[in-house]
Regions:
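Membrane-interface loop-to-helix entry segments
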Residues: 51-55, 136-150, 223-243, 278
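Membrane-interfacial catalytic/cofactor-binding modules of polytopic membrane enzymes
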Residues: 183-249
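N-terminal transmembrane-helix/juxtamembrane module of multi-pass inner/ER membrane proteins
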Residues: 2-57, 76, 80-151
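Membrane-interfacial alpha-helical segments at the cytosolic side of multi-pass membrane proteins
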Residues: 153-160, 234-252, 282-291
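Interfacial helix-loop-helix junctions of multi-pass membrane proteins
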Residues: 40-41, 192-196, 228, 261-287
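Aromatic-anchored segments of alpha-helical transmembrane domains
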Residues: 26-35, 89-95, 178-186, 259-268
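Transmembrane alpha-helix/helix-exit interface in multi-pass inner-membrane proteins
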Residues: 94-110, 174-205
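Interfacial segments of alpha-helical transmembrane regions
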Residues: 79-87, 152-188, 196
Length: 332
């Protein structure tokens, strides 16, 4: 078999989001290895308890080895393979702090502050403190944490509905949005308003003790020091709304109060500049447009090089089998 054919079989035996994870693994593992070999990190405050670079490198390597073993040896573990993209996204996310520091792109925090002031004539997160109230603080905090649930929950509902097309389009669109956002974090490091201009606020945000604690716990993740641009919270919230409107309309209406609260809450909670949100929305529309197109192209390439598409219970040998009448269901 020619080398190009073997390479094509190897690449297109994977799903697109799996290849993306492996591509991210290389610079991430290199950065973690270099950071682990360097002098010990000195992190202040709650972040001092953050696991060291070596421990996180071993975790990342272990997840990657498990994934390769899963693809090779356990094709019947279909659900495990379906959730692995989110495992990779989470694993890469918690290591981005080292990647940002290692590649040391210029910090654009001051530029974001200036752009916000030029757009509005004032700094929006400072202006929003006039609305501070314990109820709003708790509500926006809950919405903010739901970032970790909105996209995956939509995917799970589509999975249980056994709608293969909608599930694949949703999963790939969300993962694309996340990885593009990760690139933004590394290329344009920026701090959140709460860290960049703490002296500008005259009103402290307080709600219930438990939710106050969860907000304070964010300081234990070093990425929050430089992971503001673009706003992936807002990007994924809007993307989940758009995907739900297209694929699961009733869930769109369920999400509306929480997704809206999340977007508004990033300003109220001083987590993002408005420019971060605009940049996140650009990612949203791009991922929403690209996800289905990349999935369909990948299916064609998989049929061409691998001879079939066998993903999470789906097994087809022709494109006619792959997308009958424009819709694809779970294989039996």
């Amino acid at each position: 078999m020619p080398f190009a054919q073997r390479l094509g079989r190897t690449i297109f035996h994977l799903r697109p989001e799996e290849l993306l994870a492996l591509v991210f693994f290389v610079p991430m593992a290199y950065a973690l290895a270099r950071m682990a070999a360097a002098s010990r990190d000195v992190l202040a405050g709650p972040a001092a308890a953050y696991p060291g670079a070596l421990a996180r490198l071993l975790t990342l390597a272990g997840a990657t080895i498990f994934f390769l073993w899963l693809v090779r040896m356990k094709p019947q573990w279909k659900f495990a393979r379906d959730v692995m993209p989110f495992v990779f996204c989470g694993n890469i996310y918690v290591n981005l702090h080292d990647l940002i520091r290692f590649y040391s792109a210029p910090d654009i925090t001051t530029d974001l502050y200036r752009w916000d002031v030029r757009l509005f004539g004032f700094e929006p997160t400072v202006w929003a403190e006039r609305f501070a109230h314990p109820f709003l603080t708790d509500y926006f905090t809950i919405c903010y944490w739901l970032f970790y649930a909105l996209g995956p929950l939509l995917g799970l509902l589509l999975y249980l509905k056994r709608d293969r097309v909608a599930f694949r389009y949703t999963l790939l669109s969300v993962v694309l949005c996340l990885y593009l956002g990760y690139v933004g974090y590394v290329a344009w490091p920026a701090s959140a308003p709460r860290l960049a201009i703490p002296g500008a606020y005259s009103v402290a945000l307080h709600g219930s003790p438990l939710l106050d604690f969860t907000r304070e716990a964010i300081a234990g993740v070093p990425l929050t020091a430089l992971g503001a641009f673009p706003s992936l919270h807002c990007a994924v919230a809007l993307l989940a709304l758009m995907l739900a409107w297209r694929h699961l309309r009733w869930f769109f209406w369920v999400q509306i109060p929480f997704a809206t609260g999340l977007i508004v809450g990033t300003i109220y909670l001083r987590q993002h500049w408005v420019v971060d949100i605009f940049a996140g929305f650009v990612l949203t529309f791009f991922a929403f447009w690209l996800g289905p197109r990349l999935e369909r192209w990948w299916e064609r390439m998989a049929l061409r090089y691998a001879g079939s598409v066998e993903w999470a219970g789906l097994k087809v040998d022709t494109m006619a089998d792959a997308i009958p009448a424009g819709r694809m269901k779970w294989g039996g």
